[in-house]
Amino acid sequence: MSTGNPKALNQSLPDDLQSILNELDRTDEDARQLVSGLSEAQVNWRPSPTAWSVGQCLAHLGQMDSVLTSALRTAVRQANKNSLMPRKPIQPGWFGRWFVNQMEAPPRRKMKTPRQGIPEAHKSGEEILRAFIAAHDELRSLIHDARDLDLNRIRFRNPFIGLLRYSVGTALLVIGAHDRRHLWQARQVCIAMKR
């Protein structure tokens, strides 16, 4: 359901990367369904002063995914120069599995939002959705560009937590879990809105 990377549509991918692309498609569709039929006031409605609106949940994901994808792209470019091959399926280590699990919905604990991920309030659902899908399209392009690399061996510095380094493969799984976490949060806002 990508909005448009034609190059991406014509190339086959390993199963693990195809699964991530399929998840991005499902996430895009979930986001579309969440905002469809909501007025701008409903997209920006917050159940409490400290809670996020549906729009803020999606804007946060778009911002975080975009910043993270940019950091991943830098690591992949460097790996392409150094030719870290052959490719192996994504296999996070114990820390990677733990980190992915911490991101999953429903949240087990609240996490502090990095400055770059604090969403603006009062945007239209259409504008938020466009930015969200554009961030996913950037990620789709990156996945295709990295399809021949061993994503377990390419490490990068997390742009939000500078001391944290982990593999590009783990980061792709973290992005999916983080997206599910905040889509779950947005659904909870919709449920609260109907009460």
Where are these regions (language model features)?
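Aromatic-glycine hotspot motif
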Residues: 1-195
